[in-house]
Amino acid sequence: MSDPFEALKAEVDLLGRLLGEAIRKVSGERFFALVEEVRLLSKARRQGDGAAAEVLSQRVERMPVEEMEALVRAFTHYFHLVNLAEERHRVRVNRLRTEGETLENPRPEGFLALAKALKERGLSLEEAEAHLNRLALLLTFTAHPTETRRRTLRHHLERLQEELEGGDRERLLARVVLLYATEEVRKARPSVEDEIKGGLYYLPTTLWRAIPKVVEGLEAALERVYGKRPHLRSPVRFRSWMGGDRDGNPYVTPEVTAFAGRYAREVAKGRYLEELEALVRDLSLSEARIPVPKEVREGGEGVERFPGEPYRRYFAALYRALEGEALSTEGLARALKVAEKGLEGVGLAQVAQAFLRPLEARLSAFGLELAPLDLREESGKLLEAAAELLRLGGVHPDFLALSPEEKEALLTEELKTARPLLPVGEVPQGEALRVALGALRAWGDKGAHVVSMTHHPADLLAVFLLAREVGLYRPGKPLPFDVVPLFETLEDLERAPEVLRRLLANPVFRAHAQGRGGVEVMIGYSDSNKDAGFLMANLALYQAQEALHAVGEAQGIPVFFFHGRGTSTARGGGPAGRAIAGLPPKSVGHRLRLTEQGEALADRYAHPDLAVRHLEQLLYHFAQAALGDGVEPKAHWREALGEAGERSMARYRALLSQEGFFPFFEAFTPIREIGELPIASRPVYRHGRVRDIRDLRAIPWVMAWTQVRLLLPGWYGLSALEGLPMPLLREMYREWPFFATTLESAAMALAKADLGIAERYLKLVPEGLQGFYHHLAEEYRRTVALLEAIFEAPLLHNQKTLERQIALRNPYVDPINFVQVELLARYRAPGGREDEGVRRALLLSLLGVAAGLRNAG
């Protein structure tokens, strides 16, 4: 097999030349010469030419802002094209590896490898089928500022992908010209409606095509290993937070929540109608040729067209029912099963497999909702809403003044009755109650209600009280949706087992959990990292899962985990399959939830084949973890890592609390500018307060460090491991998947960081604060040396593709950083914030670095 990376480089070269021609056509020869000059200087700097950096810096300092904006746009478009070429490269490599696998030598982390592992573990085909059909991998799509591409750009990139297949150079050039001449910056901050439409984009497109391939791939793999084909439904389902996540986002109103559910249902309905229309066209089976079951005949009786073609009539009737909103997910699933059995009963199983099974797979993955919507609200807002409701109902005048225990007791007593509290005709004056009740009424109750910043059982019982008010709760019965505590900070993670113990002892919540078949618990990777630092956050999350699982086991109620991961290393990013392998043994039940957000959506789902491979890797690890497989950590590993974690957290917190660090952070990084420019709908600071780092949201905290190429949240504090013996560290790395995953995630962040670029931002920092940077640079070097000693190899020793990708991209990200430093200086100068040209160019630079690094926050 020829080196696929050579094909990637050839395609990158082609697209680069086409972009050069587009720049000439749209912006002229003089500007093209400038782009080339900057590109060559950047390349020379990378190759060790020290003078090139200063020449480039001086060149940028003299540029008019219009030229800077155009330069950033040019290099950002290069990344869009490189990302496209990389996606195509990964598709080619995936196909080659799949074609080359054999039963004796299956592809790592693939369906065939999974089927073999299940058989080697002693599962019969029936047991393997039952196990896989029980699995529920829920992928939850969330909107975040890291997905920086407009839908118009996505459209051009998708068409470009098709034109690359055709190989017509003139059409390729025309498409690249269109791409280059398209405005990529939003004129205003995106609305939540924009985020909903953009965030759901991949569900009815690439994932719609991918899901049947996932089910087909699993079934075919089991058939190869066991000799008989099973009947599987999709183990993958989807959820959405877009339009339901009200935590700190004042723009998510009840009207937006209603729009989100309605939009997703309309999109799904359109796709299902297309599928049914295709079945009407395709299933032209004549009743004169084959026997037809009674149910199929009767199902199509109301249709006058297609005499003698009962299957066409049957699916035409289903089309009409769905169009008229007279069909549920369950009803459509039953109807498809009737048709499938009818075909199989007359020896036409192949027809059912080819034409009906793909639709059944989609229905089991998406339902008619496409991605049921979750609600998320902060506990304080829910308690505030409950307090007004209790006051208006004459139950208690000042609920918020009660202790947590008193709140729980009062709510438990109140929830024994079914009476609503709001007097007839009374309109709530408080915004918290009005919004909470409005959202519950607007919501389709198909997802879950997540309570962020959960501290006490009363935080969740408030949801029951509010749900009762809109007719969703009856005493002693479970709610029709999960109520999910979210534990985020280190303190909350440590307190989580006790909170869960008290929840499961509470009669209201226990009856609910039993009725729902278990309790879902969400753990947050973002705030815990910002709170405790990288190493301690990872350790605390691991320990919390062990303890929460033990509480559920002791109470006889399953605990299912919802992992609130981001795309960056600091927020639990990295290869998601390996992360599942690193979870505590026995903590993974048959249901697992993960967030999917930011540019992870484009990275994983831009092409159906990439989507299939990503889901294949997740399912490979999830299916085995759900059987209780995993490495139980040795006692001395726990002790050693516990001590190192404490030291790491102490160092991290000492840095953040040191006088002058917050002013250094605001000067060194573009954090203020991220908040001021139209990147995302959610405010950067919680509650609008700006006192210190605690008021800052986790995503912009990570994004700011990524922009300056230091990626501090993804590695800082790891040098605390230096206190442990090297043989012990190497043993833990070799034998403990959790520890290996943690270190390899940090290695990714360290490899993407660049001190040479980070140092350019020092010109923005007052001299008295520059010592912070020198400390961080020294910590960076120490941490790299430590990890390479543990690995006994370079940082990316087992991630060669990523290593080559970084080398390919860096010379083109660097110029954007050079420009960004100068733009920040101009923006912060008197009058700079009013300069629209500087604002636009700066926003473009933020988006450009995000496009170049691919996991901005």
From Swiss-Prot:
Keyword Lyase: yes
Post-translational modifications reported in the UniProt record: The N-terminus is blocked.
Keyword Magnesium: yes
Domain of life: Bacteria
Entry note: thermal dependence: Thermostable. Retains almost full activity after 10 minutes at 65 degrees Celsius.
Needed cofactors: Mg(2+)
GO cellular component, one term: cytosol
GO terms classed as biological process: carbon fixation; oxaloacetate metabolic process; tricarboxylic acid cycle
Catalytic machinery residues: H144, K530
A Gene Ontology molecular function term of the record: magnesium ion binding
Reaction equations catalysed: oxaloacetate + phosphate = phosphoenolpyruvate + hydrogencarbonate
EC number: 4.1.1.31
InterPro entries xrefs: PEP_COase, PEP_COase_bac/pln-type, PEP_COase_Lys_AS, PEPCASE_His_AS, Pyrv/PenolPyrv_kinase-like_dom
Keywords assigned: Carbon dioxide fixation, Lyase, Magnesium
Function: Forms oxaloacetate, a four-carbon dicarboxylic acid source for the tricarboxylic acid cycle.
Assembly notes: Homotetramer.
Protein family according to the UniProt entry: Belongs to the PEPCase type 1 family.
Protein name: Phosphoenolpyruvate carboxylase
Organism of origin: Thermus sp. (strain 71)
Encoding gene per record: ppc
